[in-house]
Each structure stands twice: as structure tokens, then as C-alpha cells.
Amino acid sequence: MSSTQGALVGVGPPRFSIKRAGPPPKHRSLRGVENRWALAFVAPYAAVFVTFVVYPVAYALWLGARPSLFVELISDPLYLPTVVNTLFFVGIGVNVTMFAALLLSGFFLRPRRWIRLLLVPYLLPWAIATVQACVSFHWMLIDQRGLLDGLLSALFEIDGPLWFNHRWLAVGANIIAFIWKWMPFWTVIFIAGRMTIPRAIYDAASVDGATGVRRFVHVTFPLLANLYLICTLLTTLWALGDFTTTYLVSGGAPALSSHVLATLGFHYAFDTAKPALGVAAMMTSLPVLIPVVIVLMRRLQVREVQL
């Protein structure tokens, strides 16, 4: 072995280090400018969101989270009847609204000109402002001067009930007003959903003998089930937080017995000057509200949306 070979024994192959070159200085400066512009555009929206959403919610949770408030709330004789009213308002109002809207969406798709013309007045309660709709409904039922009681007296010579002198009549009036206001909106949504169902599916069902009720049960409703569920969950959220309907239709009458949680919280906060108790009253709806929101968000995250 020569001296040169001996020197090379134990020496591995030569190593090369490759240094990754970053973006040119010009590109780095452009990226920094883009990031600064992005922050500049996002900052106003973030500031508005923090000011008008995050801060009020956090402050309300801090204000109404004291255990003593919930003890005071449960001991108040108004609270438990209000919870019952809220359950009836949400349970009956939401389910009747959604199911009736689903049925009427099929009616308004019939190829009759007079049906299309009937759709215009049907949509009016939803098309007008919520305050106007609720005030109009209140005046239709007020005492003996209301439209409904006047029609009963003129047509059948009977005196109509005093709607706002009895608790369950007042709660029923609130529920009917909610249905009357929102059923047209969901009818339009279900009409749009029905129009996306291919006609070939109905033709195949007709060949198999599915008509009328059977076609609705086995074809239409399964195809609209996901849409129906999402709309029902969304309406439940709206109904739980609905303040305008009860406040303007019955106003809590008689003797504050027809309140729901939204209006009871307002009553505590402004009529009795106990804002913390009002927030606590609203927070008691969270055990229902949070699961509904979670289920709704999961349904909205489904990649393949089934009508």
C-alpha cells in the first residue's frame, strides 16, 4: 500500500452542504408589505367584533354568573311559569311552523295561476317589518275592538274571548303570531328545496305506484330531511331569543304571566332595575341553546349536502 493510499484509508466520500437560498430581498419586502396590508384591512373588523360581540358577551357572562342570582331567580314566582311558557312557545311554535311550511311548499308548487296569485298575500306577514307585523296582530286581538272578535260578533253574534286577560290565551296568541310571521319565510325555503329535486325521481316513483302521501313520505321528505333539520335547528335558535313577538303581542299580560325568558330578562333589567338578574334569566336558556348550536354547526360542516 502506497503512502497516498494509506492516507486515504478511513476517509469517506466528500460531503457537500447545500444552503437553501431564501426569497430574494425584493420578494421578502413584498411579503412584508402584503402582511401589513392584510393586518390593516382585518384590524377594523376585529376591533368591531371585539367591541360589539366579545366584550358584551364576556361582560354579560361576568355580570350574571353569580350563584346568588340563580337562587334569587328560582325563588321568584315568575320564573318557573316563564320557563314553561318558553318551552311551549319554542316547542309548538317551531314544529308547527316548520311542518306547515313543508306542506304548504308543495301546495304552492301546483301549476295553478290562482295559487301563484295567492302566494303574494301569503308572504306579506314575513315581507313587512317584524314590529309592524306584531303590532298588527296585537290590534287584531285586542279586547272587543279587535278584528277577530269583531268578525265573530258580526258573523255569529257571539263575543270573542278576551285574549290578553287569560294566561294561556295570551301565550297562544304569541305562538300564533310567531307562526304567522315566520311560516311564509320557511315556505319559500322549502319551495326552493323542492325545486332542486329532479323530476325523474318523481316519475320513477309514479311508475312504482307512489303517489300523494306515499310519494311525500318515501320520496320528498327523505330528500328534504337534512334541509328540514337545519331549518328547524335555526328556527329553534330564533325562537329561544325571540323578544319582539311576546313583547309587542301580549306584553307579558295578564299580570306578567305570559312572559318568555327573553322578555322576562328585559323586565328584570329595565322594569325592576336588576340587570344582573335579567342576564341570569337569559343564561338559563344556555343548556338548550348550546347543544342546538353544536348540532347545527356539525350539520353545516357536512361536505356532501343532502337536500
Where are the language model's segments positioned?
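A structural signal for multi-pass alpha-helical bundles of membrane permease subunits
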Residues: 34-307
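Short, Lys/Arg-rich, polar N-terminal cytosolic tail immediately upstream
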Residues: 1-33
